[in-house]
Amino acid sequence: MGGRAIVTDTNIFSGLESNTTGVTAFSMPAWQLALWATAYLGLVLVAVTGNATVIWIILAHERMRTVTNYFIINLALADLCMAAFNATFNFVYASHNIWYFGRAFCYFQNLFPITAMFVSIYSMTAIAADRYMAIVHPFQPRLSAPITKATIAGIWLVALALASPQCFYSTITVDQGATKCVVAWPNDNGGKMLLLYHLVVFVLVYFLPLVVMFVAYSVIGLTLWKRAVPRHQAHGANLRHLHAKKKFVKAMVLVVLTFAICWLPYHLYFILGSFQKDIYYRKFIQQVYLALFWLAMSSTMYNPIIYCCLNHRFRSGFRLAFRCCPWVTPTEEDRLELTRTPSLSRRVNRCHTKETLFMTADMTHSEATNGQVGSPQDVEPAAP
């Protein structure tokens, strides 16, 4: 998170600089700075382009505008904002240890990018909850469009509330002629306020959402993988739909695992640093921080790649979006995949599915000769 990195880096780095002249203890050779700049630039370009394309694919094609995909839009928007604002400006600050962007942007940097990170994990949690209801409880009412929009708005409001303390206590200081953007916690004896904030953020924005998603996807997986297909339908549409649901769940589990792996070292960096403050005085800590921050920010660029690799509709959308590239050749099937509506027979089949699922809920596999398998909610779960 932008503010957290700024606070720790600047407060520690400032103390070191007060005993140095000219070049700071955290300066790095030009070639090293160029390598880091290239790594961060590549990350930002891939993340912004990929997430903007995901948003376009969903908004530009009516067939893709579904409850789960609106949460995916929210996730993509949050990741795009994190890459554009947090990764870019925090890298400049961490590599130079000077705040170039003014007081107003100091407040902004300690609010909006942090909010976006919170929105990202909460959007993934909302997707897990939506899939849980659709697959485990298929006969329960699904979220309506107004409720979905209200949920997304609520996610942003909660995220803003969690990020606001850092923004409120943000300030500009000047140390040895260098401008700093720091968070001055009131009466923070021994850094207890900072440690408490890091622990609260870790629990509310990392640990608890991951526990909720782990439970949700575990139940979803058990429900899908134990679901049997009647023998006479083993090669029909129901089997394809069941496989599509499984593929979507695998994709979202991969998204969650990627987020968890990318962000865990970054959270631990700040929590452990609250107990061992002397580690921030080691010269190698700047390189450690830049590596951990890049790993955390890289989570913003993986999701579009996962969607493209594991979902045929998003793959078609990416081909259409990049059709101007000479090595990309979209087909008519790609266009139809995003624009055609389900056939009458498929819609009738979905209605029949709901009826027969209800009638055969307690039947064994051998008895369900007229049953339909799969949730009646989403024929193509990858574009639910």
Curated annotation (Swiss-Prot):
A lipid is attached at residue 324 (S-palmitoyl cysteine). Its main location: membrane. Residues 1-32, 91-107, 171-196, 273-290 are extracellular. It comes from the Eukaryota. Residues 57-69, 130-149, 219-251, 311-384 are cytoplasmic. Disulfide bonds join 106-181. One of its GO terms (cellular component) is sperm midpiece. This is a receptor for the tachykinin neuropeptide substance K (neurokinin A). It is associated with G proteins that activate a phosphatidylinositol-calcium second messenger system. The rank order of affinity of this receptor to tachykinins is: substance K > neuromedin-K > substance P. Belongs to the G-protein coupled receptor 1 family. CDD domains: 7tmA_SKR_NK2R. It is a multi-pass membrane protein. One of its GO terms (molecular function) is substance K receptor activity. This is Substance-K receptor. Glycans are attached at residue 19. It is found in: Cell membrane. Keywords: Cell membrane, Disulfide bond, G-protein coupled receptor, Glycoprotein, Lipoprotein, Membrane, Palmitate, Receptor, Transducer, Transmembrane, Transmembrane helix. The chain crosses the membrane at residues 33-56, 70-90, 108-129, 150-170, 197-218, 252-272, 291-310. One of its GO terms (biological process) is positive regulation of flagellated sperm motility. The gene is TACR2.
